[in-house]
Regions:
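N-terminal assembly/interaction segments in proteins that build large macromolecular machines
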Residues: 2-259
Length: 259
């Protein structure tokens, strides 16, 4: 005798899993009305769907940063389209993964992430995969997340959290490639010197003038690329180095991630 799959039973399974009504009904029919078996069937289906989508390109996504005490974690979650990156289930998954990484540790989060991700793959129909995950610890840490697509975490020695947040926002906006001029290696300097030397080579000026022009181009280029030399985005009359000196602070780390 066949088991009648009631609307209430389907609704109960849907509320428990978030999976579509059609898939819930199908799972309940296959499980002959057994709720636990139906949940297991849906999990197996989620895993199978994820496997089929494994070779797709998940180039979009979102990033989340959360902190508690002296610990800050960043988690990036990738999907195929911007549409899904704004999906409620996708964003809840990202939030849950970030909470788990913060409260239980990154390794534990990664262990538990597959089943959580597979469920969202089944709901959205897109490939979803875990991206960059890292942790920053320290007494003074600030972060800035821009439109859920990029994030910066800045750790300071001295200063305060608001200062760290301001510098994180600056880094997100200005995208410096180096923290200090000493971070620029000789190979990069040589490459840029050759590029700018070609630009001034045919200028009708004396050699000493061209040499000064070359030096000026080099100085301007690396000033724009170096965090400490950049004018602070909130006060262009002050460089980041001057801002830090004013607050008796030093940068100990800058981490940035963009989808």
């Amino acid at each position: 005798m066949s088991i009648q799959i009631t609307t209430e039973l389907v609704k109960e399974l849907r509320n428990a899993t978030g999976i579509s009504v059609m898939q819930c009904r199908k799972a309940l029919e296959e499980a002959e009305g057994d709720m636990q078996k139906a949940v297991a069937i849906l999990k197996k289906t989620s895993s199978d769907i994820a496997l089929k989508k494994a070779d797709r390109n998940a180039a979009d996504g979102a990033v989340s940063v959360k902190n508690a005490g002296e610990k800050t974690v960043l988690v990036a979650l990738h999907c195929e389209t911007d549409f899904v990156s704004r999906n409620e289930d996708f964003l809840k998954l990202l939030s849950d993964l970030t909470d788990k990484a913060l409260n239980e540790g990154i390794d534990k989060m990664k262990e538990d992430s597959k089943e959580m991700i597979d469920g969202v793959i089944q709901k959205t129909g897109e490939k979803v995969e875990l991206g960059e995950v890292f942790e920053v610890t320290g007494p003074v840490v600030g972060n800035y997340v821009h439109q859920g697509k990029s994030a910066v975490i800045v750790s300071l020695e001295g200063g305060n959290t608001e200062l760290a947040k301001d510098i994180a926002m600056h880094v997100a906006a200005m995208r410096p490639e180096y923290i200090t001029s000493s971070d620029v290696n000789d190979e990069i300097k040589q490459t840029m010197n050759e590029i700018f030397a070609k630009e001034v080579a045919n200028i009708d000026k004396p050699e000493d003038i061209k040499e000064k022009m070359l030096e000026g181009k080099m100085a301007t280029y690396f000033k724009e690329k170096t965090l400490m030399d950049q004018p602070f985005i909130k006060n262009s009359d002050q460089t980041i180095a001057q801002l830090l000196d004013q607050n008796k602070a030093k940068i100990t780390s800058v981490k940035r991630y963009s989808i």
